[in-house]
Amino acid sequence: MNKKNSIWLLVAVWTLVSCGTVKSTREKPAVALAQSSLTPEQQRKYDYFFLEAMRLKEKKDYASAFGLLQHCLDIHPNAASALYEVSQYYMFLRQVPQGQEALEKAVANAPDNYWYSQGLASLYQQQNELDKAVTLLEQMVVRFPAKQDPLFNLLDLYGRQEKYDEVIS
């Protein structure tokens, strides 16, 4: 990238960061979340098995922890916490399609969780799915106005895709 483009990119970043207070006055889009239809007994079981899975993970008993997470998903198929943890296991096992699917479901079921969204955006970038990464990062910039990482990642992707008009707008 030549010096002129670098200067324009720096000016654009500075402008967007300095306008961060304007973004906070925008209304947040309404996100329809599936209400948990678990009975108190089912919720208690889910919590128990999830915490037990985390305990086993900490003890490095990964196979047992993964089995308990699968049981958690049998109890509550849309539980974002279990979906996220399962996605991490799939990624470790290099089963990226299954990991990506689980992570996408986790983000869909917990859209206000910054870390789930950040993980999915990073995965999209690693998989060279830049359009999906841009779409998610654009949503994150609106949803998490106090976080600057999504904004910088978005500007980087715009630069790589040579979408200079998007950087300025």
Locate predicted features.
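Canonical positions in the second alpha-helix
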Residues: 71-72, 105-106, 139-140
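Register position in tetratricopeptide repeats
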Residues: 58-59, 92-93, 126, 160-161
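Alpha-helical segment of the N-proximal tetratricopeptide repeat
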Residues: 42-75, 92
